[in-house]
């Protein structure tokens, strides 16, 4: 385990004197971005960061992120600052340099946002030459990914309606089109949100399959920010969604600055998702005074955590890819400059919002940890009910925030462990980005070669409490047949399951029932963990080091414990797992109900 990860896992509540959000952003994050952009200005297309060529052609958003990053730095200095003309000249040169490069969807939004910022301060004409601006007016258009006949998205998930809407609104402000397109896109965006969120207020990333993740909670805040950015008030309906998203994120506030815990694109984006939602909620005035204080204290800790953990002093870059860390292939290291710029922008614009609210230079609340102790210990967030239930249980246990999502990863994500129906908690329990190993769920390999797993189809979810213990029960009338891009329901096995969560311990008990005798090649389950130095006795493993103290599996033929030695297949967003417990059942015919389970205790 790396020294950096050891320090992260063993750190208790933050002891350093609280520093204002503005101070961290302006003294730690903005100088880091300015240094990267200085390297870009010096090296141009030859620019390399930590051995990675910036202009590889693989980042479809890079020109827009460069434009927004330059605008963020340019506008952070006063108009009479001697650096301002140099920054404007650099923007002009790099705009001309990258104008013909691929720049899609989010990149278009970032670029038009940068241009509107420059227009508002009267710097657009100086920062972009006329020929380049003429090209940009044609290319920075939402119509490149929206069918103008019926306003459906072209090969993009439904959250891209928000991107298209933002581009259209900004084009109106730039004087490039009238408001008709943005109004139609707003209607489509809100229709989708209503259709697939129902009464609960969270966006399904799919057309009703049930993928509710970080982005499902973040999207309401992004929509609100598009209105704020373009100078108007979000509709009341959007404000209601923001409030619901804020509830989810308030339940996740912690003293470390850790972020959202499950699904794709977490790591630093899990942290900034919480920052963006809480900031939007503050900006549209849906938080009370105590919630404002908690939110501000959290965003300050989040910025500190980002600067201390995610920024690499040796390379001068954000690091999501090395030191045993792993992120989605979508955010590979080929996007190194763009990822630096987009994460930093999320801190820049949210810091500006808090400054406008009167928090510039204000230290966070001094009794933050005590205030966290007073937060509710349990919250149940329903995403959908119907043929299948989709829900998120959140528990607070000491410094841990534990999330148990019962959702469906849907097409492209159902087979990846960050979407499994298992507990997640920063620094304690994690999935593996794009990872397919059977983390805390059994995979049934049948005689015909099919692999079945209990991942997607939840019914009759019930959540009850008994003192400090929370009990979750559900059934699955069918399980997920793996191997395809989308989940496939398979009724050859049914499941009834019970989770029991109490302070310091989580237990799962499953009963799998075959509809008819099944030829099994085997059953496999794993538990990969940050804990180290495991000693095994029968099916119980006790760990000498790390957050998990004990793991016990039941119902399996055998379990084996091994050290992982920074195995690339077992890396998580914050660093590598240290150990793995592998449990198996050998080939047999399954005729009767089979009881399997596990229990883990944590420090």
Task: Report residues per predicted region.
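Short coil/turn connectors between adjacent alpha-helices in alpha-solenoid helical repeat scaffolds
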Residues: 74-84, 119-130, 175-180
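Extended polysaccharide-engagement surfaces of secreted carbohydrate-active enzymes
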Residues: 255, 259, 274-574, 603
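Extracellular polysaccharide-recognition and catalytic grooves
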Residues: 134-374
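An alpha-helical repeat/solenoid feature that recognizes helix-turn-helix modules
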Residues: 55-76, 101-121, 157-174, 213-217, ...
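Short Pro-Gly-centered flexible turn/kink motifs
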Residues: 581-603
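Helix-loop junctions that connect tandem helical modules in alpha-solenoid scaffolds
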Residues: 52-55, 94-101, 146-154
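Low-complexity, Ser/Thr/Pro/Gly-enriched N-terminal "stalk/linker" regions
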Residues: 16-88
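Bacterial N-terminal signal peptides
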Residues: 1-10
């Amino acid at each position: 385990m790396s020294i950096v990860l050891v320090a992260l896992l063993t750190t208790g509540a933050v002891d350093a004197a609280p520093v204002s959000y503005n101070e961290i952003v302006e003294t730690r994050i903005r100088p880091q971005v300015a240094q990267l952009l200085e390297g870009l200005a010096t090296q141009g297309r030859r620019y390399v960061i930590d051995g990675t060529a910036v202009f590889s052609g693989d980042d479809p958003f890079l020109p827009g992120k460069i434009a927004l990053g330059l605008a963020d730095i340019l506008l952070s200095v006063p108009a009479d600052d001697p650096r301002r003309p140099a920054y404007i000249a650099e923007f002009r040169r790099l705009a001309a340099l990258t104008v013909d490069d691929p720049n899609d969807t989010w990149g278009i939004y970032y670029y038009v946002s940068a241009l509107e910022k420059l227009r508002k301060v009267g710097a657009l004409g100086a920062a972009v030459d006329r020929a380049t601006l003429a090209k940009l007016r044609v290319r920075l258009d939402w119509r490149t990914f929206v069918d103008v006949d019926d306003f459906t998205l072209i090969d993009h998930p439904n959250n891209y309606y928000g991107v298209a809407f933002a581009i259209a609104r900004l084009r109106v402000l730039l004087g490039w089109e009238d408001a008709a397109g943005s109004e139609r896109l707003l209607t489509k965006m809100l229709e989708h949100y209503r259709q697939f969120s129902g009464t609960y207020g969270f966006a399904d990333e799919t057309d009703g399959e049930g993928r509710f993740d970080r982005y499902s909670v973040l999207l309401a805040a992004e929509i609100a920010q598009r209105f704020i950015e373009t100078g108007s008030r979000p509709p009341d309906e959007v404000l209601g969604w923001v409030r619901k998203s804020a509830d989810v994120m308030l339940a996740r506030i912690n003293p470390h600055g850790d972020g959202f815990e499950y699904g794709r694109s977490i790591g630093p984006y899990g942290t900034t998702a919480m920052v963006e939602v809480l900031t939007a909620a503050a900006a549209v005035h849906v938080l009370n005074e105590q919630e404002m204080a908690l939110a501000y204290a959290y965003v300050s800790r989040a910025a500190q955590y980002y600067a201390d953990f995610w920024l690499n002093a040796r390379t001068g870059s954000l690091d999501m890819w090395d030191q045993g860390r792993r992120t989605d292939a979508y955010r590979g290291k080929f996007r190194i400059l763009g990822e630096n710029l987009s994460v930093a922008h999320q801190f820049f614009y949210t810091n500006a919002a808090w400054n406008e609210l009167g928090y510039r230079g204000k230290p966070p609340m001094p009794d933050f940890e005590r205030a966290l102790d007073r937060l509710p210990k349990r919250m149940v967030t329903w995403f959908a009910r119907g043929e299948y239930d989709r829900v998120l249980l959140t528990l607070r246990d000491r410094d841990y925030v534990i999330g148990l999502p019962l959702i469906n990863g849907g097409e492209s994500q159902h087979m990846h462990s960050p979407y499994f129906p298992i507990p997640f908690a920063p620094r304690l329990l994690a999935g593996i980005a794009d990872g397919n190993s059977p983390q805390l769920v059994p995979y049934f390999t049948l005689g015909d070669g099919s692999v079945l797993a209990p991942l997607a189809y939840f019914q009759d979810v019930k959540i009850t409490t008994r003192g400090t213990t929370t009990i979750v029960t559900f059934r699955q009338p069918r399980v997920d047949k793996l191997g395809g891009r989308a989940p496939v329901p398979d009724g050859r096995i049914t499941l009834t399951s019970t989770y029991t969560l109490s302070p310091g311990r989580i237990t799962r008990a499953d009963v799998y029932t075959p509809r008819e005798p099944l030829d099994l090649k085997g059953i496999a389950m794993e538990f990969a963990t940050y804990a180290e130095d495991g000693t095994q006795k029968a099916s119980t493993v006790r760990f000498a080091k790390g957050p998990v103290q004990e793991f016990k599996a039941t119902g399996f033929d055998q379990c084996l414990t091994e050290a992982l030695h920074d195995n690339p297949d077992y890396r998580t967003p914050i660093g590598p797992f240290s150990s793995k417990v592998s449990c198996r059942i050998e080939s047999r015919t399954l005729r009767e109900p089979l009881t399997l389970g596990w229990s883990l205790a944590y420090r």
